[in-house]
A protein has these predicted regions:
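Extended recognition/assembly regions associated with phosphoester-bond processing machinery
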Residues: 1-406
């Protein structure tokens, strides 16, 4: 990207910058490494102890009555560093540069162009890893459209009229006024992405979950992912929900349990995604507070959970990192994140290819089914299952934003 710019290897980052003499201080160089953020508003155990003991302090969790521990922690007062295997150096934005360092979160491996300052590196530009281009999908006639549906947060331990309407629409048990673009016969798979068993407290509740999944899986293949409120291991990657939870559903061959994060393929279309924690943590620790912005940031940086293991527990793999997106696995056409407040989607241009991003809503709060065409992933439909006698079918002209940005 930066022609005629001296590159300093990350394993000699501070050594290389330290060897720049005062005469060479204004020379532009490129460095790369791992981004580390010193977040001033980050929750602190000591701050909680001080608050409980009534000791005065400066942390907003103690001094601001309106402060919520779910509010974003990122602020303009955060300090951002670039780290190698020996030490770190602070990054500051060079005067006149439009680079926004605050939208970054810790854990991203990026390159920066700039000059050496006094005790810092003055950034003029930054670059993400080169994007991976997914395999081209042969375009077919629009009449051959086949869709994969996405829902999350069904919370089958709670009553929900919208969920019953969803099951009726999938199975064809009831006739409703739907748009032809939302024909249930065009859906070839349903992805239930996390928090399916939220609110389940009794055996009767579990039996209802099993019955619901079996009913749906007899009409369309179902892929189910574990979430933070499901009975699965705490650290990423979460293992598939155990088949013993679903004695009736497991008899249906078309019910598949996946890990979280999950990568799977339907037709020629590859899907990669996780339940909400990965994207939510990015929104907490950067100024990218929109879920789709956070998801795009992780896609461009080629890492699913950049804040792990700092803010998200993850299993320490010694030889490889399953949370890093590499060319060793099929490259995704669609990336999704689930259990969010609202459903949204976006198509981003990565140069040689386009990537579809999905924010899947928690169904009990925002009862929306997102449909992605496996023959054209930029073709996204949504159906809003509100508690009424009709379903609202919305296509690309619906109220969900779809940006085509780079």
């Amino acid at each position: 990207k930066w022609v005629n710019t001296k590159a300093i290897p990350s394993d000699h980052l501070l050594e290389g910058i330290g060897h720049v003499t005062d005469r060479e201080r204004g020379v532009t160089v490129a460095v790369y490494g791992c981004v580390v953020k010193e977040v001033k508003l980050r929750p602190s155990v000591l701050a909680e102890i001080q608050k409980t003991a009534g000791i005065s302090g400066t942390h907003p969790a103690m001094t601001s009555e309106g402060y919520s521990m779910t509010d974003p922690y990122a602020s303009d007062e955060d300090k951002i560093y670039l780290e190698d295997n020996s030490s770190r150096i602070r990054l500051v934005v060079k005067d006149g540069s439009s680079v926004d360092l605050n939208r970054l979160c810790q854990g991203l491996v990026l390159a920066f162009k700039g000059t050496r300052g006094r005790g810092c590196f003055e950034v003029d530009d930054m670059a993400f890893p080169l994007p991976l281009a997914p395999k081209m999908i042969a375009r077919s006639d629009s009449s051959d459209a086949k869709y994969v549906g996405f829902v999350s947060g069904l919370c089958l331990g709670q009553e929900s009229e919208a969920r019953s309407m969803l099951a009726e629409w999938i199975t064809g048990a009831a006739v409703h006024k739907t748009d032809t673009v939302a024909d249930p016969s065009t859906m070839v798979r349903l992805v239930v992405a996390g928090d399916t068993l939220a609110g389940v407290t009794t055996q009767a509740d579990l039996n209802s979950v099993d019955k619901f999944l079996a009913q749906v899986a007899r009409s369309v293949p179902v892929t189910i992912l574990p979430g933070s409120q499901d009975p699965a291991n705490f650290a990423l990657p979460q293992q598939p929900l155990h088949s013993a939870l679903f004695p009736e559903s497991r008899k249906v061959k078309d019910l598949t349990a996946e890990t979280n994060p999950a990568r799977f393929q339907v037709g020629d279309c590859v899907f990669l995604g996780s339940t909400g924690a990965c994207a939510k943590e990015v929104t907490q620790y950067s100024t990218s507070t929109d879920v789709l912005d956070a998801l795009e940031l992780t896609a461009r940086s080629r890492v699913i959970a950049p804040t792990a293991p700092d803010t998200i527990a993850c299993y320490p793999f010694p030889n490889f990192d399953p949370l890093v997106i590499t060319e060793d696995e099929p490259v995704a056409h669609v990336m999704f994140s689930s259990t969010h407040n609202k459903a949204a989607f976006r198509v981003v241009d990565l140069g040689d290819a386009k990537l579809t991003l999905l924010s899947v809503s928690t169904f009990v709060f925002d009862p929306v089914l997102l449909l992605v065409n496996i023959n054209d992933p930029s073709d996204i439909k949504r159906i809003n299952f509100k508690a009424s006698d009709t379903f609202q079918a919305e296509g690309e002209d619906g109220d969900t934003p779809m940006d085509d940005t780079s």
